[in-house]
Curated annotation (Swiss-Prot):
Topology class, membrane: Peripheral membrane protein
PROSITE patterns: ABC_TRANSPORTER_1, ABC_TRANSPORTER_2, NODI
Keywords in alphabetical order: ATP-binding, Cell inner membrane, Cell membrane, Membrane, Nodulation, Nucleotide-binding, Plasmid, Translocase, Transport
EC assignment: 7.6.2.-
Localization of this protein: Cell inner membrane
Protein name: Nod factor export ATP-binding protein I
Purpose of the protein: Part of the ABC transporter complex NodIJ involved in the export of the nodulation factors (Nod factors), the bacterial signal molecules that induce symbiosis and subsequent nodulation induction. Nod factors are LCO (lipo-chitin oligosaccharide), a modified beta-1,4-linked N-acetylglucosamine oligosaccharide. This subunit is responsible for energy coupling to the transport system.
Amino acid sequence: MPVNGARRSDERMFMTAIDFSDVSKTYGDKAVVSALSFRVSPGECFGLLGPNGAGKSTIARMILGMTAPDAGKITVLGVPVPAQARLARKGIGVVPQFDNLEPEFTVRENLLVYSRYFGMNTRKVEAVMSSLLEFARLESKVNARVSELSGGMKRRLTLARALINDPQLLVMDEPTTGLDPHARHLIWERLRSLLTRGKTIILTTHFMEEAERLCDRLCVLEGGRSIAEGRPHDLIDELIGCEVIEIYGGDPHELESLVGPYADRIEISGETLFCYVSDPEQVRVRLRQRAGLRILQRPPNLEDVFLRLTGREMEK
């Protein structure tokens, strides 16, 4: 179930906002997406989580009808895509991975120009512009050129632009890549407010914290395939379920023989030993015998889920 209770009446007509059924896409001899199936409910934030090259951006392009699948069926807002992609896009707002704002236009001019893709007249755009700029916290920048904005401001303007047509569905491709932590948290706060208003969001990301904070459900991708799907905390509980101790500064294989008998499970990634334990104190007692180690004890997270599923850490 979505984290929010609000639902727009026009969204209730669709049992699913997005339906992928056995979708595949190949470029040359490389399978980018392989027999992928998932459904996104209206009012839900659904995440596509995976490293670069996992197929996330290709999936986003297929949702928009910009890339045709080689096999399978895609339905978006009740219509088949790409066959009726133009109709579907009337109800979609897009936040691309890289900003494509007009740098020499002002904030106001960027919104006006983009609105013309939806046949909106200037009077209608002016009527909603102040609320969009307030939402994006850009009221004081309405006449500033895009080239004068910070990276975080540009991303917030791109988000405001995506909302110009009051879409039912937002497709967001790596929306906080390249932002500093403060700017990233501000975008997350804005997205949570959209969910409380009943918007549907599909989000591609490789940020584990972003997926945990925003997504009702997510699909973990590797090599264009789904390797897990579910609620973030359900995946963490089912696949990990215990405390994690990260150990640095020694030979991980030697450390494994030292603490392995007291761990539920051990994973090694590079120079780091990940020790999954129900009783952390027993492991910490053994580690005190070794000088020069750096030790971090923490709750499990989606990074641990990915490591458990693939045997490696998420590549940024």
